[in-house]
Amino acid sequence: MSFMLATIKTASGPRAAMVVGDRVLDIAAASGHAEDATMLHIMETWAETLPRLDALATKAATSGIPLSEAHLLAPILNPGGIFCAGSNYGDHAAEMAARSGQPAPPDPHTLGLRSWHFMKTRHCIIGPGATVTMQPRSKKIDWEIELALIIGKTARNVSEADALDYVAGYLIANDLSARDLGNREGLPATSSFKADWIAHKNWDGSCPLGPWITLARDIPNPHDLKMVLDVNGVVKQDSNSSHMIFNINEQIADLSRNFTLHPGDLILTGTPAGVGAGRGEFLNKGDVVRLRIDHLGELVNTMA
């Protein structure tokens, strides 16, 4: 029986849960394994825990609480790392280059380049339905729909051919960005102090995740998922994960050549065209941002 993994708010704190249809089951309470209370532990013991979860799924369908009554948090609250692919859709790379009057960059494969990533911290994570506090120093907060994946077993120097074997599941992410804080004013482009990726990509609430983790085995093809983001009901991004420059296999292989990926780590695989920076539009207080990806549900947050 298919199920999704979530983290819910309870009187005793955040608890890992499974979603089966319109029911939600506290995994640790149902399994009798207290350590199953956190999503990180479930990922760290994924191979051993998955059969137990499969056995619980039938129980979840007839017990637990209604999904409508569950308070969903971000599916994982404390990943060891959040690695975000930069400029990984050709149309997005082109729209960002056009901002400064530059031509669309060539496919980096033709230059012998590999994927590149920056990082967000877990302090930035919020869940579905949560309110995003605007970065007070920024007037140009932007949206970015991203297909995210969660690692389910330790990965080091893995091959592209085997890379998907290390993915436990997929979820939706919004890589919120403060476009006017990414480069420090008054400094030449060649200055070592020009770029500020922390201010650009990291503040409390800048990494909405959710609504849950859909298991990798339930995704027919992660490289063919429709992705749509709208702001106040107006579609801004409408694309497909098939348009990635560096696919998921390449990204996992590239990252694992540099360091060990651990269970619970997240990889955000890039955003397509349609971001606010390319339109000269940015988010305002009260805006409702809705993200949808095939098979993964929808992630909705309000700006404040």
What kind of region is each of these model predictions?
Residues K120-R179:
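Non-heme Fe(II) oxygenase catalytic core, chiefly the N-lobe of the double-stranded beta-helix
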Residues R99, W116-Q135, A155-R156, G205-T214, ...:
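Short catalytic-site patches enriched in acidic/histidine residues
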Residues A11-P14, P51-D54, I65-H71, P75, ...:
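Catalytic-pocket segment enriched in acidic/His residues
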Residues A6, L72-A74, P105-P108, V132-I141, ...:
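A generic local secondary-structure boundary/capping motif
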Residues M1-S115, V228, V288-R292:
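N-terminal non-catalytic cap/leader segment that marks the start of a structured domain
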Residues P103, H109-L113, H117-K120, A163-S191, ...:
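Flexible glycine-rich active-site/ligand-binding loops centered on an Asp-His dyad
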Residues G13-P14, N78-G80, G112-S115, T121, ...:
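Short coil/turn connectors at secondary-structure junctions
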